[in-house]
Each structure stands twice: as structure tokens, then as C-alpha cells.
């Protein structure tokens, strides 16, 4: 089985939990992290050896990403979901 490569959108409480779980799973890799709070996103990216995305679209559209974890505020979910669907990514 190949490694599942993730983009993580949002590094609040639940985003941090998912970042850690992705990191601890040997069959997954955290490739990109994005959050409107750049400093918080940078901390998580550095902690888990991921790249910091400047925009959600940058993370979602990268060809190295297989799936997108949407951990942002609920009102933003639909926009990110549509971006990920358009990019043909698995969505969590």
C-alpha cells in the first residue's frame, strides 16, 4: 500500500490532533499545512516536517497531495470542499 499524502487546512484544536495522527501513521504523510494564522501553520509545518502553503488552493492543487483534511471554521468548509473536489482530491 502506498503512503497517503495529506494537505491539512486549519491548525486549530482539531487540526493539531489530525496533524499528529497523520504524522504517527507510517502509511501517511503530512505534505502541506495551511491556516489563515500563518505563524500557527508554520509551527505545525515545522513540527511535522511539512511544507507551509501560502494559500489553501496551493496546498489542495499540489499534485503530491492525495487527500485534504478540512479542519477550518465550519462556515469555510464548503469553499474548501469545492476546491478539493474540483482538484479531484479525497476529502476528510
Predicted regions and their residues:
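N-terminal Rossmann-like dinucleotide-binding module
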Residues: 1-48
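Beta-loop-alpha module in the N-terminal Rossmann-like domain of NAD(P)-dependent dehydrogenases
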Residues: 18, 50-92
Amino acid at each position: 500500500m502506498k503512503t497517503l499524502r495529506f494537505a491539512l487546512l486549519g491548525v486549530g484544536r482539531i487540526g493539531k490532533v489530525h496533524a499528529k495522527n497523520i504524522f504517527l501513521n507510517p502509511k501517511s504523510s503530512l505534505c502541506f499545512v495551511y491556516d489563515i494564522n500563518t505563524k500557527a501553520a508554520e509551527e505545525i509545518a515545522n513540527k511535522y516536517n511539512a511544507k507551509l502553503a501560502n494559500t489553501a488552493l496551493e496546498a489542495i492543487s499540489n499534485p503530491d497531495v492525495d487527500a485534504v483534511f478540512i479542519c477550518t471554521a465550519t462556515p469555510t468548509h464548503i469553499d474548501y470542499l469545492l476546491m478539493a473536489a474540483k482538484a479531484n482530491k479525497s476529502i476528510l
